[in-house]
Amino acid sequence: MAALAGTIAGIHFDLWDSYGYRHIPHIGPLFLLDAAAGVVLAVASLVLPARFVALAWLGVSGYGAATLAAVLVSLWSGLLGFSETTSAPLLAPAIAVEAAAFLIGAGAALRARHRTRLLS
């Protein structure tokens, strides 16, 4: 889970830093905030005690869902005045990792929650 959150964070920071997304009004600061959130979630999923790990994984799942939804909205109708194109840099890897974070994170959180209930 940490790797997925970290990868999403890295993609957003790279787009912000190397591809000029920092200059897009409203979207630029959100990309930097998104990168920071991914780092926090990656660290949290590694250092939280076992009883809270399902919460961290659920956070990674929500993070993946939110970033995936944002990119899809920006592709289809635009988001905050910005419309993404299908030729955008890192678009395919971003969609793949965000979808994986959502699906794997949700499954891992449910499994961890179930396992915690069995041990209680």
Model-derived features with residue positions:
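Membrane-interface extramembranous regions
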Residues: M1-S120
